[in-house]
Swiss-Prot record:
Organism: Escherichia coli (strain K12)
Reaction equation(s) it catalyzes: (6S)-5-formyl-5,6,7,8-tetrahydrofolate + ATP = (6R)-5,10-methenyltetrahydrofolate + ADP + phosphate
UniProt-recorded Gene Ontology molecular function terms: 5-formyltetrahydrofolate cyclo-ligase activity; ATP binding
Protein name per Swiss-Prot or TrEMBL: 5-formyltetrahydrofolate cyclo-ligase
InterPro entries, per the entry: FTHF_cligase (IPR002698), FTHF_cligase-like_sf (IPR024185), NagB/RpiA_transferase-like (IPR037171)
Alphabetized Pfam families for the sequence: 5-FTHF_cyc-lig
Gene for this chain: ygfA
Gene Ontology cellular-component terms listed: cytoplasm
Function: Involved in the removal of 5-formyltetrahydrofolate. In vitro, it is a potent inhibitor of various folate-dependent enzymes in the C1 metabolism network and in vivo it might function as a folate storage. 5-formyltetrahydrofolate is also used as an antifolate rescue agent in cancer chemotherapy. Catalyzes the irreversible ATP-dependent transformation of 5-formyltetrahydrofolate (5-CHO-THF) to form 5,10-methenyltetrahydrofolate (5,10-CH=THF). The reverse reaction is catalyzed by the serine hydroxymethyltransferase GlyA (SHMT).
Matching SUPFAM superfamilies: NagB/RpiA/CoA transferase-like (SSF100950)
Region (Disordered) location: 1-21
Amino acid sequence: MIRQRRRALTPEQQQEMGQQAATRMMTYPPVVMAHTVAVFLSFDGELDTQPLIEQLWRAGKRVYLPVLHPFSAGNLLFLNYHPQSELVMNRLKIHEPKLDVRDVLPLSRLDVLITPLVAFDEYGQRLGMGGGFYDRTLQNWQHYKTQPVGYAHDCQLVEKLPVEEWDIPLPAVVTPSKVWEW
């Protein structure tokens, strides 16, 4: 149902909301202070990350994208992403940078990790796509200096999500109209 809501947005609405959210994210203090920021390439009606990526580049931030780990199933690597990066389609039909070990940045060296989500609630819980990739990535985020933040449309807010023991709540979510912090 939430995916249908975001898919129902017109291209013009998507573009406008992507710009609004990017502007809001660029004023979020952890992003302002960051040197390295991991983000994702949006698909399936997700909040458009292209305006954010372009603003991050203009601000001199190093941008990283998630890549499915080739040897450790269910885990992510983060590779440097720049305008000349070669993208390939992964097994989930999502574009990611072509794997080059020289471009990998350890999670502990990421300042901010911007996460996709299907839905979030007023308590910071996020509902992902079901693969558990970000739950595994975020399970020990407090031990790193990495600051996670969700990135979503306003229409992805729900009253309360069911919580499983492996679910990792987010300390913040940025939408086109608001920064939610817990």
